[in-house]
Amino acid sequence: MLRFVRGNLLEAPVEALVNTVNTVGVMGKGVALQFKRAFPDNYQAYVKACERGQVQIGRIFVYDRGPLAQPRYIFNFPTKKHWRHPSRMEYVEEGLKDLVCRIQELRVRSIALPPLGAGNGGLPWPEVKQRIQEALEALEGVEVWVYEPVENPKAHSIVPLKTKPRLTPARAALLKLFGLYGALGEPLGRLEAQKLAYFLQEAGLDLKLDFACKQFGPYAEPLNHVLARLEGHYIQGFGDRTGISQIRLKPQALDEAVLFLADYPKADEAATRAADWVKGFETPYGLELLATVHWAVRHEGARDWASLQKRLQAWNPRKATFPKTHLQVALDALLKRGALRPEEWQDRPPKLPANVAQEA
């Protein structure tokens, strides 16, 4: 029996669940991220299978959790080769053929699957739905639940990792910086989290993040994996990256971080220093502006106004439109607060707008 339903796939009372994956061992968004958190044993087995080349288009990687587990089986269904690429309809079609074989081979009597490739994969749901119907409706004695696309899950409903990750100096300092930044109770988004982590590393704490200049300023993809691990234990609202993040510290998280940092004064000082650098720039645009100017001067050798403007124009059209008055305010703050050394800027000091100069 084939039925199309809505709700939480992970709560389906079935013998097997289908998880959509890529072939390179990454579960970073959407349904896959939910599975990674809910079934870490499956994730570890999937990563090892990818390393061995066992996860391929048209081949379901089945993970057996044992006869007493609910669900017993996780069917990892590749809908794309690389996590950066979109899903392809022919991959779904090939996978459905193997899915039918695996269901029959294992004598599965009930199974639930997501809208294969129609979420983050970008495939049109009506066409995917038709392929699913054609492939699975003829199965006899099998109850098939197909979960249709709905809005991205709310960040607070994302399943956290089952094991609380331990604090490290880097994680604790990041949590403290988030707490100082959000002292007024406002949540922060992924852009702000990226820029805060950038300044924390520039403040002297090696987070082992390799930042690069991206559309909205310095960006390090691995930071998202760090935040995903902290989600549900120390922070809430990061989500699965398919919607807007509204990150807040969970109750007691800041206290835990501060207590932990008592034994790591250098990490504690870096968090305090980074928080001081960003004062007055506590908006997504403000942090983007500040981090962009800092990056251009420190990492791309902009030493005067002409070279700074040239770097921004080469970055992208968005950066080229930053008003000079905004650049002056950002550069002045970075120099006066010690985020940039005096010798890093060889041109005349920034001339602040009259209203800003009076406030200073």
Swiss-Prot record:
Q: Does the keyword Cell inner membrane apply?
A: no
Which residues carry out catalysis? K80
What result is annotated for mutating K29E? Reduced de-ADP-ribosylation (of macro domain fragment)
Where in the numbering of this chain does the Macro domain appear? 1-155
Summarizing the annotation, the consequence of altering K80A is: Loss of de-ADP-ribosylation (of macro domain fragment), whole protein does not neutralize DarT in growth experiments, does decrease activity of DarT slightly in vitro. Does not neutralize M.tuberculosis DarT in vivo
- Which GO terms fall under biological process for this protein? peptidyl-glutamate ADP-deribosylation
Per its record, the protein catalyses:
an N-(ADP-alpha-D-ribosyl)-thymidine in DNA + H2O = a thymidine in DNA + ADP-D-ribose
Q: Summarize where ADP-D-ribose binds, as residue positions.
A: 8-9, 20-22, 31-34, 79, 117-121
Disulfide feature: none
Is Calcium one of the keywords UniProt gives this record?
no
A GO MF term: hydrolase activity
Which domain of life does the UniProt lineage start with?
Answer: Bacteria
Alphabetical UniProt keywords: Hydrolase, Toxin-antitoxin system
Functional description taken from the UniProt entry: Antitoxin component of the hybrid type II/IV toxin-antitoxin (TA) system DarTG, which plays a crucial role in controlling bacterial growth and bacteriophage infection. De-ADP-ribosylates DNA modified on thymidine by its cognate toxin DarT, which neutralizes the activity of cognate toxin DarT. Upon expression in E.coli neutralizes the effect of cognate toxin DarT. Upon expression in M.tuberculosis neutralizes the toxic effects of endogenous DarT.
Q: PANTHER family recorded for this chain?
A: ADP-RIBOSE GLYCOHYDROLASE OARD1, PROTEIN C6ORF130
Q: Which family does the similarity line name?
A: Belongs to the DarG ADP-ribosyl glycohydrolase family.
Q: What's the protein name?
A: DNA ADP-ribosyl glycohydrolase
